[in-house]
Amino acid sequence: MTQQKKNYVLPIAMMFALFAMISFVTGLTNPLGLIVKEQFQAANWMTQLGNAANFIAYAFMGLPAGMMLKRIGYKKTALTAVAVGFIGVGIQVLSGQMDYQPGELTVFWIYLTGAFVSGFSMCMLNAVVNPLLNTLAGGGKKGNQLIQFGGSLNSISATIVPVLGGYLIGTISQDTRISDANPALFIAMAVSYTHLTLPTT
């Protein structure tokens, strides 16, 4: 029994990290929205489209995520979600490397596509982390405790994102571009890659 519990330490730790990752990737849409406003001289409502795209993806992915859980299980669904998140953030990085003409919104739409794909990942991860933590803990009171702790990490990450984003991106001005957010986006990609390469058993 002791050996079995030890085997659960890494999966539980990874679920905690995924809780934080969900909040971190979602929170990046706020500073990116401010950058979009300056780079494209966008209207205020357009600055929230990245955040909206992230959450609209939940409406499209909620049911498929549940079907994936039933068909391929927690582990493969989580790995798929992390891979999708890596791609989504990668698309946002790509948008920051593209040339554009003033008034042209192609780069903006590519950025929104990345935010939308990232939303797919966050939805899938949300579908995995809560029930899997509960299962790993054996359900009951201990399962609830682990979920509450994971939720606390999610909240802490949400608090850290604006501070870390401000440090990595710096003061946002008319000269700020999406590419200036690359350090923060690279961190999100690195976290995703780490989860893809770590053993899950």
Mark where each language-model region is.
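Glycine-rich segments within core transmembrane alpha-helices of 12-TM secondary carriers
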Residues: 147-165
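Extracytoplasmic
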Residues: 17-36
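C-terminal ends and interior cores of transmembrane alpha-helices
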Residues: 84-101
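Central cavity-lining transmembrane alpha-helices of secondary-active solute carriers
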Residues: 52-66
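Conserved small/polar residues in nucleotide/adenosyl-binding loops
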Residues: 194-200
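Cytoplasmic helix-loop-helix junction between adjacent transmembrane helices
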Residues: 123-149
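Hydrophobic core of transmembrane alpha-helices in multi-pass small-molecule transporters
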Residues: 106-124
